[in-house]
Regions:
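N-terminal export/targeting and maturation segments
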Residues: 30-79
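Short solvent-exposed beta->alpha transition segments
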Residues: 59-116
């Protein structure tokens, strides 16, 4: 009888240990996943920083965008010019009237001119102003991985990763 009681205690401890292990692993997994709200927070912060005329473009590049470590000077100049182009567009708008939409929320008509090329659509968000799209961004690891002005005409917009 003493042996069966000891065996039950061991089984109970084992079950309890497995339960705690499941809770801990679920918590760790949940921390790694970004929620749609996290993406919007990242995008809003990026837009606010673009809208700030006192913040240098190279600071935005280094702090808000994901780039490769081997970004040559020509590519960096091109990227800075691209940020400035979006920046001018954003600064001309009342940022309180901007909308932040996921790829799914944007609708098929508006997203048909975006070529995802294997990008997870859950990472793609749009900035919209008064029924017009301003730009689209890919968000990864709490930073902007890529952005593009929304295409007008017959050409598809592509995301470029630097």
């Amino acid at each position: 009888m003493k042996t069966s009681l000891t065996g039950m205690k061991i089984k109970l401890k084992l079950v309890l240990l497995m339960f705690i292990g499941c809770l801990v692993s679920q918590g760790l997994f949940a921390q790694e996943q970004q929620t749609p709200n996290d993406y919007v927070v990242v995008l809003k912060r990026f837009v606010q920083r673009l809208h700030d005329p006192d913040l240098a473009t190279d600071i935005i590049l280094s702090q808000d965008l994901i780039t490769s470590k081997k970004l040559d000077e020509d590519l960096q100049d091109y990227l800075l010019a691209s940020i400035d182009e979006i920046r001018i567009n954003v600064q001309s708008k009342d940022i309180n009237q901007l909308e932040y939409l996921s790829f799914a929320q944007a609708g098929r008509k508006e997203t048909s001119d975006i070529d995802l090329e294997g990008i997870d659509p859950q990472q793609v968000y749009f900035v919209k102003y008064l029924k017009r799209f301003v730009f689209a961004a890919v968000i990864r690891d709490k930073k902007i991985a890529s952005f593009t002005l929304v295409s007008k005409g017959n050409n598809k917009a592509h995301f470029v990763f630097y």
